[in-house]
């Protein structure tokens, strides 16, 4: 099994009626910018371990690194809701940054969902972010008002499916089954890292009949579609308000094209990035959407010089 090189501690931070689980490497150092890492959809803060381990000693020593489990993921408590709203992630992040760095801005890195949140947060709270890195946080395809009736209907239908139990996440007989699932989703993930991730991505639970199965640490309600259409005009205005130097990183596999199949393309995403006042792009080679798992050394090598 993979052996973590830099061991974090677990902290629980009260945020908006939730106990937020946060993995923390190092201590706060006056004058040193904290680094905040936020994960993507159906993931956990532990996913960043491989990148943290790949950072050089010169960079990591004396810098506090913070990686929360978003609400409804990992060890962060479920909010007691049956669907999730993107603005809640921004507010949670705002409280989290205030807790760990009340007096100075932070460096913020987000992957996928976390990258989208990071971009929106950086444009909404520009004074709180020193430098920003977005890993594959592409946003969503543009929408039209005519889609609204169908979107609301789909949202209500999916809520009913959730409450019927139709959207429950699959459970596994053991941690090995969880690891196999991770490798099926990402064929580049090696066995040792999959085995290590499995213990943080899921947990064993014993049912009333005495049977124990491993359950994914993610709320099934995350599968519910957002009731509101993606408002591209609003997003681009927020991008224009980002003051932090920004690095947009994508994987060589073009996961955006593979997922949306022409409905939304890398070329469109690159056009959107032109709205960010100070933005540059980089590509991680031989990597897919989970590029921080596939090539942690490449990701770390991009992060370090940009965040110095």
Name the predicted role of every residue range:
Residues 135-170:
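A catalytic-pocket lid/entrance helix-loop region that shapes and gates access to the active site
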Residues 240-287:
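Conserved loop-alpha-helix segment in the C-terminal half of the alpha/beta-hydrolase fold
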Residues 24-78:
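Conserved HGGG/HGGXW glycine-rich cap/lid loop of the alpha/beta-hydrolase fold
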Residues 103-148:
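Conserved hydrolase catalytic core segment
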